[in-house]
Amino acid sequence: MYYEGEIDMIINEHLNHSAKYRVSTLATIITCLTAFSASLMANQAVDRFGFFETSFKATGRYVNPYKDLQASAVIRRPDGTRRTLGLFWDGADVWKLRISPDLLGEWRFNVRSADEGLNGQTGQFTCVPSRRKGSIQPMPGYAHHFAYQDGTPFLFWGDTAWALYQDEVSEKLNREAVYHYIDERAGQGINVMHSMLLQEAGWGNRGGDPFDSMARETLNPAYWQEIDVRLRYLNDKGIIGGLVPAWGDKRKTEPFAWRLFPGLEARKRYARYIASRYGAYDVYFIVSGEWHAEIRTRPNVTEQAIRAEFIEIGNALHESDAHNRMVGIHPMTQQGSVREFNRAKWMSFGDYQQNYRSLHARILESRPYPGPIVNSEYGYFLRDSDFDGEVDKNNSFSAEAMRHATWDIVMAGGYTVTGYGTTYMGGNRDKGPFNVDDPRNDIWERQYRVAQSFLSGLDWWKLQPHDDWISYATPRSSDRNVRLASRTLLGPPKTTYWLLAEPGKHYVAYLRGLKGKVTIDFGPGAAGVDKVRLLNPRTGETRSINQGTIVRDRFEWSAPDTEDWVLHLSN
């Protein structure tokens, strides 16, 4: 017989025992699930140069997580070395980590953060062999050229798509149009596209605007999630993305320019965000577009101060990028070059020009500096930004001018990013709409591909400029003024001749406007050549022009006309 109080005690003990059992069982289940999850992650196979992503949830409450909270992961690579990579906020309480592994074996990471939900999170995966090549880097042993991360030489062949990640209804620019554009360009051999992450016309995308307010640093994750989708598609088509985080404000009206952040720390925070979010893709970074514009539009600043600030922003981006992607910066037309940044520890390019004049010479001027040299803006085929029916950009008024400009650059050992009026700005600054299928572009698309196909058939990275080994009766001419109906534009020289050589093995001569004999010297100690082929850069047609005999010391040849021609001499 039990007293009333004893019955209550027995009932409570029974209930406590049941509750404890349930708690114990739940804890066991959680432990097993955690172990199972960890096992799944440990067994997750990720391609070498592939893409690993994992998510975590913060438990704290923050007014502005993008600004108020930081998180990073210490990554232990298979060789025992460690790198630190930032996590990025992706909306609500979600934080993500992205890694593109470059070494085979087991990778581990440990998250550090002031947030209890993030701090101490761990994970691992196994990097396995793949056919992926990775992003790009300066080629070891050939500093002015590119290679994939796996060491395969990379013939950088670019196109401009400043609005690749935005939408604009009036220009019929959206994700589907961008996919079609990428498909077309990939089929034409394009392997690089550089683009704005913050579009200077102020466009958003289907996710909305990039920031609700730049002054308050209220970032909109949905906008960046749409960029993720398009960038992944771009990479899947074999194209490297050149990403410009923001533009200089050259008109004081651009809604997402660098100057609109509240200060340097905000600019650096944004740079770190971009590195964390996009460094695992096949990309390179351009710290700013037209950086000189910030000098124009900020009161009481000097060029030196703005340059120092962009070096700091570049430092923040580079130091936050555990993948060590290439980094450059982009000038305004008046300056043309960014050689002044070659002392910055992050500068990976010998130059990243926007230049429309003296194209060949200005590539050569940058060769004393290490790193590949790119002219990233030298012409936009048939661009008509004021819609008056007439082209308004230098070198852009004909396929001939674009072709001459392109060959003048590559014959100095430089690389090109071309562009088309109908696509380079998403249809903006052209009559529009965004249209990769405009038949007017066909001729330049074909001729741009001809140059790429020719160079890719050679060990182009071994060719060095030797313009002093090619001679003609008259000197090379200068850039020419071309009169259109209502304006005069600059075009490449009418008469010129250039030579690239791997002495004793290969000689590539490009010439135009010649009416007589050109002479190519083979250089000291060369044994001569026994093969001479002629390329028509307008059509891609090639033919042999020697008689099978060895040509020693020098080669003399007269062009059939004053059009441009390419000679390839080899043994």
Annotated model-derived regions:
Residues 1-21:
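N-terminal secretory signal peptides that target proteins for export/translocation
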Residues 25-37:
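Bacterial N-terminal signal peptides
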Residues 43-47, 61, 71, 383, ...:
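Aromatic- and carboxylate-lined catalytic core of secreted/periplasmic carbohydrate-active enzymes
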Residues 43-79, 85, 124-129, 491, ...:
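Non-catalytic, glycine-rich low-complexity segments
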Residues 70, 116, 130-360, 369:
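Active-site mouth of glycoside hydrolases
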Residues 74, 81-143:
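Extended acidic/polar, glycine-enriched regions
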Residues 96-100, 519-521, 552-559:
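Exposed aromatic-hydrophobic patches
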Residues 344-429:
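Catalytic-core region of carbohydrate-active enzymes that cleave or remodel glycosidic bonds
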